[in-house]
């Protein structure tokens, strides 16, 4: 049991570190997905541990919503890159009114 908890906490920590310390928006999206997938892995593990399938079904819905989120996020990212020529988070200050 502790191996899954350790793995998920390491993955979540790596994702949180990437979101906090990286300036590239694409890398930040990947780190957010890493955090989300670590929580999904933990939810699947606890669902299997308690012989309950509802947690595993819930993970499928989370993955579908995450796919839609990434699709919209990447579309916005492409438009930002076309407009500014950079996907650095600091370049978004140019979009202020």
UniProtKB/Swiss-Prot annotation:
Q: Which reaction does it catalyse?
A: a quinone + NADH + 5 H(+)(in) = a quinol + NAD(+) + 4 H(+)(out)
Where does the protein end up? Cell inner membrane
Its EC top class is translocase
What EC number(s) are associated with this protein in UniProt? 7.1.1.-
Task: Give the record's family classification.
Answer: Belongs to the complex I subunit 4L family.
NCBIfam families on file? PRK05715.1-2, PRK05715.1-3, PRK05715.1-5
- Could you identify this protein by its name? NADH-quinone oxidoreductase subunit K
Species the sequence originates in:
Cytophaga hutchinsonii (strain ATCC 33406 / DSM 1761 / CIP 103989 / NBRC 15051 / NCIMB 9469 / D465)
Name of the encoding gene: nuoK
